[in-house]
From Swiss-Prot:
Coiled-coil ranges from the UniProt annotation: 41-72
Protein name stated in the entry: Probable protein BRICK1
Cited PANTHER family: PROTEIN BRICK1 (PTHR33668:SF1)
Keywords associated with the record: Coiled coil, Cytoplasm, Cytoskeleton
Function as written in the Swiss-Prot or TrEMBL entry: Involved in regulation of actin and microtubule organization. Part of a WAVE complex that activates the Arp2/3 complex.
Subcellular location: Cytoplasm, Cytoskeleton
GO molecular function, one term: protein-containing complex binding
Family from the record: Belongs to the BRK1 family.
Major place of residence: cytoplasm
GO process annotations (BP): actin filament organization; cell motility; regulation of actin polymerization or depolymerization
TM annotation in the entry: none
Record's keyword annotation contains Chaperone: no
Domain of life assignment: Eukaryota
Gene: brk1
Length: 75
């Protein structure tokens, strides 16, 4: 009987080692996905803020160009 238990025990230990390895990889993939999602949200937020600032600057430039074209003073 002892001879039959050794291969079974080895298979059980190997199975647990494989499961632990898979758990480590799964956990790492989840961490990477969480980071990428967070990075995506951060980038989108920053780009939206930058877009708002650029839009405001474009409007100011158009206003100033219109005043210059009409010959108005800027003061």
């Amino acid at each position: 009987m002892a001879g039959q238990e050794d291969p079974v025990q080895r298979e059980i230990h190997q199975d647990w080692a494989n499961r632990e390895y898979i758990e480590v990889i799964t956990s790492s993939i989840k961490k990477i996905a969480d980071f990428l999602n967070s990075f995506d949200m951060s980038c989108r937020s920053r780009l939206a803020t930058l877009n708002e600032k650029l839009t405001a600057l474009e409007r100011r430039i158009e206003y100033i160009e219109a005043r210059v074209t009409k010959g108005e003073t800027l003061t």
